[in-house]
């Protein structure tokens, strides 16, 4: 098992980043790949968790130990796999997630992707009193703050809406960029590349 990998981020896609260490490029599935945009070709330390399946060995990456702990807590719940756990972490407010678990707010929990009422109830049962968002470096917290302040991203999304792109498509793309800082022009260029794929 690996605790973390230190290396150069060489590639970012919609689902993963590539971290090169000692000449080997590791595919790391992360909650918000585009949050790493400013670190391409720079050295970074990514906390990791390995999942071994019959058909694949997968590495999941995290920006902090707190985020990794949250991921491990989520995948311990019956009905939540690694992909669903990453989708939950990528959502807007991890502090809100913890509060919803503590207050047994099933309605709030079912707003996360692929989380139905039964799984939400299981989350409360398994995680109540056990999950704490302690670090200030959780990407979702940064994303909430950046979302309120990131006028450039808002302008880019409005421009693409005016170009005829669907709001549902743009909502997904906007999530990838939350927590990053760039110009509206660069956001539009990156978004167009994603939509072409």
Swiss-Prot record:
Region (Flexible linker): 143-147
Alphabetical keyword list: Cytoplasm, DNA damage, DNA recombination, DNA repair, DNA-binding
Compartments (UniProt record): Cytoplasm
One Gene Ontology term from the biological process aspect of the record: DNA recombination
Region (Domain II), start-end ranges: 64-142
Predominant location category: cytoplasm
GO cellular component, one term: cytoplasm
HAMAP family: DNA_HJ_migration_RuvA (MF_00031)
Descriptive protein name: Holliday junction branch migration complex subunit RuvA
Lineage, broadest ranks: Bacteria, Bacillati, Bacillota, Bacilli, Lactobacillales
């Amino acid at each position: 098992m690996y605790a973390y990998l230190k290396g150069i981020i060489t590639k970012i896609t919609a689902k993963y980043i590539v971290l090169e260490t000692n000449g080997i490029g590791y595919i790391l599935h992360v909650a918000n790949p585009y949050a790493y945009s400013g670190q391409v070709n720079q050295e970074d330390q990514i906390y990791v968790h390995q999942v071994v399946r019959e058909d694949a060995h997968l590495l999941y990456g995290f920006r902090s130990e707190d985020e990794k702990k949250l991921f491990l807590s989520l995948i311990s719940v019956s009905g939540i796999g690694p992909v669903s756990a990453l989708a939950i972490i990528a959502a807007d407010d991890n502090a809100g997630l913890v509060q919803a678990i503590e207050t047994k707010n099933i309605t709030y929990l079912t707003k996360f992707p692929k989380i139905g009422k039964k799984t939400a109830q299981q989350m409360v049962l398994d995680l109540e009193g056990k999950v704490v968002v302690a670090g200030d470096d959780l990407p979702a917290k940064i994303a909430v703050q950046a979302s309120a302040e990131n006028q450039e991203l808002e302008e880019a999304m409005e421009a693409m809406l005016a170009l005829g792109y669907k709001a549902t498509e743009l909502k997904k793309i906007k999530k990838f960029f939350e927590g990053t800082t760039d110009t509206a022009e660069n956001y539009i260029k990156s978004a167009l590349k994603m939509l072409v794929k």
